[in-house]
Amino acid sequence: MKLIIFVVFCITIYGSTSGQQEVARRYCGRHLAVTMADLCFGVQFDKRNTQYEGYHWPLLAYSEERIKRQGIADECCLVPCTTNVLSSYC
């Protein structure tokens, strides 16, 4: 009886933690830019909307920290990454 309870407990714990893991995905091109804008500024784009043309994107500015490490495209387009990695570039 104790074995059955232990097995059920282990299955329950495994099931509840496996759904919380974020899946790494590839973010390239426009998808990368739109995802970064959403993560960093809360901006969401409509594909046909030109409202944000000419908007200055501070995330594209060079900083010492960004120059020292690989670019975001290297980290998240060539190799899958999570949104936690993406948000580290904000």
UniProtKB/Swiss-Prot annotation:
A GO term, aspect molecular function: hormone activity
Span of the signal peptide: 1-19
InterPro entries: Bombyxin, Insulin-like, Insulin-like_sf, Insulin_CS, Insulin_family
SUPFAM superfamilies found in the cross-reference section: Insulin-like
CC per GO annotation: extracellular space
Subunit record text: Heterodimer of a B chain and an A chain linked by two disulfide bonds.
Protein name according to UniProt: Bombyxin G-1
